[in-house]
Amino acid sequence: MNYAIDKDAYIAVVKNGLASKATSILGPATQHYKGNDPYPYDLEKAKKFLADAGYPDGFETTLICTTTTSDLKQCEFIQQQLAQAGITVNINSMEKAIVSEKVESAEGPGSEVEVEMYMSGWSSSTGDADWGIRPVLAKESEPPKSYNISYFENDEMDGCLKAALETADEEKRAELYAKAQDIIWEECPVVFFANDYNTWASAADVANVKIYPDGGLNIRNARMNP
């Protein structure tokens, strides 16, 4: 699917140009970020991988998202893109509370969960690599404990996260998180689209308002310009 979705078109159509292509599970401003080459848009390669996996004619799946306008816009783009590779995507939009119940708080192993595809976003609110990876891809974070909705399990990656938390050596931590990011990029349990630009508007006479990566607003040092 990484090859079947045009990330440049996604940024232009869905994000109005206000994003950059993802090169890691982490955003570029996150501590210990290590970028990789984005997966290129290559429809023929996508079809070949599908055929090699036993789906020469594609398959049908359901993509779950919330009912927000932005989520639906993203899912409709994904639906159109994957159709060109032979994948039929049915969009199932739900209220956030229902999504939380059926997806994020699902009980039991991944094989028993009624989720085929799910569209979501994540950023490290702490600015640290661990919180950008562990909640969404560590084995210990499978629902209902946290948000590993892809039910990705990789002992080597989990080991990197564990070792990085056990050392205060920043050079060693950087190496471990770099390795974890490489594993994720190669295994690609998730299709990573883009890093949104944080954009906001304020009156010309307001200064020192800050926006955190998770969208939080910091007005602690806000002031009015004379």
Residue ranges and their predicted role:
Residues A12, A53-S70, G110-G121, T167-S202:
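Bilobed periplasmic-binding protein-like "clamshell/Venus-flytrap" ligand-binding domains
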